[in-house]
From Swiss-Prot:
GO terms for cellular component: cytosol. Disulfide bonds: none annotated. This is UPF0246 protein BamMC406_2140. Belongs to the UPF0246 family. NCBIfam families: PRK02101.1-1 (NF002541), PRK02101.1-3 (NF002542). It comes from Burkholderia ambifaria (strain MC40-6). It comes from the Bacteria. Pfam families: H2O2_YaaD. GO terms for biological process: response to hydroperoxide.
Length: 260
């Protein structure tokens, strides 16, 4: 089983890492190519391209200038400890044991606009480059064209080491990021957990709740060493319950009803 997550825009480089081990990203050469292109942009260009504020554009202009193809704990931090958004609050890597993080290293992957595909302990230099950014490059009009089938092939290398029901990809990423994966080329079926909350008289996806829940699901898989998708139906964290009637073989729906 391989779980894919989206990255986070919010980053934490202030909290010291609680584990010393780290690895190097697989696609550093590709990231360097993107950085070379990003360095040609002015802060105003970045603000327009990414639809962000001027201060945030200046911050990322400097990040691109500072970025180095040489990674070390002096200029980078393990990805799963650096990302700091809703998904990673749910995953809460800071409270995972070294053994859990080692398991995550084998089973969790993070999709990234700049880095392509990251393992949890891959060192990450600070950046902002969302996968949906229409950043024209030598390979095409956007980042989906840039990455092509590279991410899918890297996932297949891992999936092909699994067998039977354990050869499955669990999609805990957003639609924007999972578009960088080509399911028809994957060497495994895809199961997508969907999290819905009761609001306004019906169940619906509420973005920040769903993001946190996807992180919780990844944590649940890691802590319980889950290898086959059937066991995902037992997930019941923070009052979410599997709804068999709303689910099918490729979409597992979890619902929560609180306060109504």
């Amino acid at each position: 089983m391989i779980i894919v997550l989206s990255p986070a825009k919010s980053l934490d480089y202030d909290t010291p890492a609680h584990v010393p081990s780290y690895t190097k990203p697989a696609f550093v050469d590709d990231a360097s190519e993107l950085i070379d292109g990003l360095r040609k942009l002015s802060p105003q260009d970045i603000a327009t391209l990414m639809d962000i504020s001027d201060p945030l554009a200046r911050l990322n202009f400097q990040r691109y200038a500072d970025w180095s193809p040489t990674f070390s704990p002096a200029n980078a931090k393990q990805a799963v400890l650096a990302f700091n958004g809703d998904v990673y609050e749910g995953f809460d890597a800071k409270s995972l044991s070294a053994a859990d993080l080692d398991y995550a290293q084998q089973h969790v992957r993070v999709l990234s606009g700049l880095y392509g595909l990251l393992r949890p302990l891959d060192l990450l230099q600070p950046y902002r480059l969302e996968m949906g950014t229409r950043f024209a490059n030598a390979r095409g009009k956007d980042l989906y064209a840039f990455w092509g089938d590279r991410i899918t092939r890297a996932l297949n290398e891992q999936l092909e080491t699994r067998s039977g029901a354990a050869r499955v990809l669990v999609n805990c990423a957003s639609t924007e990021y999972f578009k960088s994966v080509k399911p028809k080329l994957l060497a495994a079926p895809v199961v997508t957990p969907v999290f819905e909350d009761w609001k306004g008289g019906r169940y619906k996806i509420i973005s920040f709740h769903a993001k946190r829940a996807r992180g919780l699901m990844a944590r649940y898989i890691v802590e319980n060493r889950i290898a086959e998708p059937a066991a995902l139906k037992d997930f019941a964290m923070e009052d979410y319950v599997f709804d068999a009637a709303a689910s099918n073989d490729s979409t597992y729906v979890y619902r929560r009803r609180i306060g109504e």
